[in-house]
Amino acid sequence: MQDKWDKRFTRVAQEISAWSKDPSKQIGAVAVNDDRRILATGYNGFPKGIEDIPERYEDRSIKYDLVVHAEMNCIYNATFNGISLKDATLYVFGLPVCHDCAKGIIQVGINKIVMSMDDIPQKWLDSFEKSRRMFDEANVDVHFLNGTNH
């Protein structure tokens, strides 16, 4: 039964990812409580009030200085709205959780992550391995959908 819900919320994260204006990669995140209620969503993009024009996405040095990852955007949106993510599940579509986002996920008390991606790109392997070690130590359950088994 849970697998059905994991797939549903992963599809929601995929839909949210389409809101990103990043032409190279769209990532989506959805935080859900035990009652299967959506608490917050996020996608990779610039902070509120920062103009997200195409030229800024084309210049990687500018883009990487400005972009907020989907996972942290989801956490910030929950915080902005006064919503606790303690014991929530975070569904992430598009890329694995990086080690910087892992810190935030652990800090707010998210206890399960479901990730969906075709494969983990080589350039993200080191960061994901750091995330995995942190999640293991902090007792955060990590699951994969779409046939990924990392």
Summary of predicted features, one role per range:
Residues M1-H150:
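Zinc-dependent deaminase catalytic domain
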